[in-house]
Amino acid sequence: MADTTGRIPLWLIGTVAGILIIGLLGVFFYGSYSGLGSSL
C-alpha cells in the first residue's frame, strides 16, 4: 500500500479492469437474456 511512487498500483488497475469487464459481461448477458441484446 505504501509502494505507490506516483504511479497507479498494479492491483488497483487489475481490480478496476476486472470490475469493468464483469460489469460489461453482466450487462451484455442480462440484455441478451431479457431480449434487449438479441439484435447485437
UniProtKB/Swiss-Prot annotation:
Going by the UniProt record, its keywords in alphabetical order are: Chloroplast, Membrane, Photosynthesis, Photosystem II, Plastid, Reaction center, Thylakoid, Transmembrane, Transmembrane helix
Instruction: Supply the Pfam families for this chain.
Output: PsbJ
Can you list the GO cellular component terms from the UniProt entry? chloroplast thylakoid membrane; photosystem II reaction center
For this protein, the parts annotated as crossing the membrane are 8-28
Quaternary form?
Answer: PSII is composed of 1 copy each of membrane proteins PsbA, PsbB, PsbC, PsbD, PsbE, PsbF, PsbH, PsbI, PsbJ, PsbK, PsbL, PsbM, PsbT, PsbX, PsbY, PsbZ, Psb30/Ycf12, at least 3 peripheral proteins of the oxygen-evolving complex and a large number of cofactors. It forms dimeric complexes.
Q: How does it sit in the membrane?
A: Single-pass membrane protein
Its biological purpose: One of the components of the core complex of photosystem II (PSII). PSII is a light-driven water:plastoquinone oxidoreductase that uses light energy to abstract electrons from H(2)O, generating O(2) and a proton gradient subsequently used for ATP formation. It consists of a core antenna complex that captures photons, and an electron transfer chain that converts photonic excitation into a charge separation.
Q: Does the keyword Transmembrane helix apply?
A: yes
> Predominant location of this chain?
plastid
Does Plastid count among this protein's keywords?
A: yes
Point out the gene that encodes the protein.
psbJ
**Where found in the cell?**
Plastid, Chloroplast thylakoid membrane
- Give the family per the record: Belongs to the PsbJ family.
Record-level GO BP terms: photosynthesis
Kindly provide the name given to this protein in its UniProt entry.
Photosystem II reaction center protein J
